[in-house]
């Protein structure tokens, strides 16, 4: 149902622009299904002894939940669809109990910097490319440090040829098992998707820039760039590169498309390095470490300086 909700929401939002008569009933169906889901979810929430409540992906009546404790799916098993519905599906608000519970469960399940025991292998194993699903949910929720460490952990589980096995044992596993495809191309696609969202993240009608860039990413002084990446606001090209001294500069270009309601960017890129100028657009530095830039501006350049 979570995938269905995410898909219906996407169709509903698209039809608000397209106004296709055949799809006019999608909005009411989505609302009806979401209400039914929320009612069922409130009854299925589980209180975890670690101090949070979460929504399991298997209902209490599922035969798998009646197995011996060793063979029973873990609380974090199959939470991938919940990650997808949180982001990019954006079915829930950031303070929804489903979101809060999912994040707490994934954090509590983290081993070797990524969520563990989330797939077919229930004991001392990781489903590698589940990690970027969760990292993107963290990033959308504003948990930048968790997103960064989880994505870094995911990269550290790649093979020497920069590919990922679907599931593999933890380093401490007493009995190692491997499961699934090798390499798994979905894993490679998720790597690209997260890297894109580090620079350009669509949050509803808001555009969040550099959300996933943290100081360690800038230590080598290497530039970052996206060229014509598709967004709901038109194709965007965006680059970040070193400038004179310790400064960094960015260049933003947005082509045809409706402008977002807001464009946000980090005020402080590095300790002691602050957004000083935006040429080509008005900007306002907020007290929360976020600067807003005129969303109607299609091209601008910015610079962070001491």
Regions found by a protein language model. Give the residues of each.
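Active-site core of glycosidic bond-cleaving carbohydrate-active enzymes
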Residues: 1-2, 6-17, 24-35, 46-201
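Short coil/turn linker and secondary-structure boundary residues
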Residues: 21, 94, 221-224
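Short, intrinsically disordered, low-complexity segments enriched in Ser/Thr and Pro
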Residues: 27-28, 32, 38, 260-267
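Structured alpha-helical bundle/scaffold domains in large eukaryotic membrane-trafficking regulators
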Residues: 45, 49, 207-210
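Non-catalytic C-terminal accessory modules of carbohydrate-active enzymes
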Residues: 145-306
